[in-house]
Amino acid sequence: METVDTSERLTRLRQLMQERKVDVYIVPSEDSHQSEYIAPCDGRREFISGFSGSAGTAIISMTKAALSTDGRYFNQASKQLDSNWALLKRGVEGFPTWQEWTTEQAEGGKVVGVDPALVTPAGARSLSETLKKNGSSLVGVEQNLVDLVWGKDRPAPPREAVRVHPAQYAGKSFQEKISDLRKELENKKAAGIVISMLDEIAWLFNLRGTDIPYNPVFFSYALITPTTVDLYVDEDKLTPEVKAHLGQDVVIKPYDSIFADAKALSEARKQDATGAAPKFLLSNKASWALSLSLGGEEQVEEVRSPIADAKAIKNDVELAGMRSCHVRDGAALIEYFAWLENELINKKTTLDEVDAADKLEQIRSKHDLYAGLSFDTISSTGPNGAVIHYKPEKGSCSIIDPTAIYLCDSGAQYLDGTTDVTRTFHFGNPTDLEKKAFTLVLKGLISIDTAVFPKGTSGFALDALARQFLWKEGLDYLHGTGHGIGSYLNVHEGPMGIGTRVQYTEVPIAAGNVISDEPGFYEDGKFGIRIENVIMAREVQTTHKFGEKPWLGFEHVTTAPLGRNLINATLLSEDELKWVNEYHAEVWEKTHRFFENDDYTRSWLQRETQPISK
């Protein structure tokens, strides 16, 4: 992880700020679709700050610069930021939020600027109200100033072809999905809905793309009314197959024309003499720029996207695909970890973290329906495992130490599903502390996996189950316990999840949700432990049914051994020990057929799935 000298970039940015009479400028991580993962052309925050993590906000005043990020990235940011930058540790006492820092820099009637395409209306309103209290103001700066600094070196926007996602994997036609959406519009008495989240558009139309690394989406907007369907996308990306799939009912319009069309809709609504024209729905994650084009608060109803809610509840075909792809993915992981142990221990091969990650990708790519990785593989040895979202890079990454803990968080895209799995192994002799920490984390994973709870329970409520064993020791981890996972879509999706985010209190876990279960523990400078399975919520039978409501539990689909020599069986209850042994028996049963002609991997798998006892 190298530090980038940002002095020249900041000088140029401040010149542009001065020309536009902006005193403080905000650079969010997101693109104009509020995407978590972004295309290289949208990496503005990384370009201006040098920090390459996926989450964070940069704020630049005329004399200072600050970068705010969360606990996953404190170590990484401290290494990558140069002396021009202050690191604001989100959620840590003594550090201001980026909003507080911005307000402090803007005291005395100063102007704060931001590209309105990169923030939500709610975010803009909240900051604007805070700034007003000290006489300052927030303005939208439509021409992105970082783009001007970047100039001709900025990567070109992607122009790859869009593909049809067949019904055999989608499980439902796009016409049915739009029909369901129109029922929602009718229920809300809405004029229509403008959609800007890329995974929602890909899911709704049963299309996939490659515009953003690891996320099979394409740059687009959509406008759905009770009688029309408009898809805003660069038509050059649409193959004859895609056009035939969409048919005559979907009108294709230029990508950028959404803003002009939104303004026209807003003007038409203003002309309504009755003053009672229905509003358009807009996701509360859409951009401030889109909201302004539609006429702002008065003409738009900001809602949690009904498409996000529908997408999060997988249909039977999608759930079957998830089960199937996780077995193939598990086989790839088994082959990989067996290979890695053989190279490190038996052959004494020198391998760095990237060599190992590349090998895992090569193994995965042999499996049916493979369509690429779902995120950058986190291949980390020893102390690098404590960097929660560590990204190894050739030339600066570490050689894998066979006497240290090795943490690998990885995932893949398959046509029938998306995977995300973390395994922590030690190919030598782990210390008592490492075994204790691993076992406490494992107990948390099992606690979520075996949870039974009434319908209506949120992931916020479940989160403490995963942390309870660490908490008893005065330990914790600085990330969520679980996030939603797409079906051959984004590896991170909402609206539900397991963690302490306020939004998780608002959305209960529902049957059909696919979520990660990933507690961890990190000893800075020494090692990191995380165990992650993908689980699917489903209705379960209980002896009683208090309140006459359905009760839910989980089904795990990840099939890979847990790292047997790191488990301290004396710390497990009888039920937990039974769970581990049954899980390993299931892994063997589902995956050993892949290794009929690979004696080494088969024997490794047999060893790693043997029952353990106290």
Swiss-Prot record:
Signal peptide: none
Phylogenetic classification of the source organism: Eukaryota, Fungi, Dikarya, Ascomycota, Pezizomycotina
InterPro entries linked to this entry: Creatin/AminoP/Spt16_N, Creatinase/aminopeptidase-like, Creatinase_N, Pept_M24, Pept_M24B, Peptidase_M24_C, Peptidase_M24B_aminopep-P_CS, X-Pro_aminopeptidase_P
Enzyme class: hydrolase
Any Pfam family the entry gives: Creatinase_N
Function: Catalyzes the removal of a penultimate prolyl residue from the N-termini of peptides.
Obligatory cofactor(s): Mn(2+)
SUPFAM superfamilies documented for this protein: Creatinase/aminopeptidase, Creatinase/prolidase N-terminal domain
Source organism of this protein record: Aspergillus niger (strain ATCC MYA-4892 / CBS 513.88 / FGSC A1513)
Record-listed E.C. numbers: 3.4.11.9
Single GO BP term: proteolysis
GO molecular function term, any single one: metal ion binding
Similarity remark: Belongs to the peptidase M24B family.
The reaction(s) this protein catalyses: Release of any N-terminal amino acid, including proline, that is linked to proline, even from a dipeptide or tripeptide
Protein name: Probable Xaa-Pro aminopeptidase P
Gene Ontology cellular component list: cytoplasm
Positions bound to Mn(2+) 2: 409, 420, 532
Cofactor note: Binds 2 manganese ions per subunit.
Binding site for Mn(2+) 1: 420, 518, 532
Annotated keywords: Aminopeptidase, Hydrolase, Manganese, Metal-binding, Metalloprotease, Protease
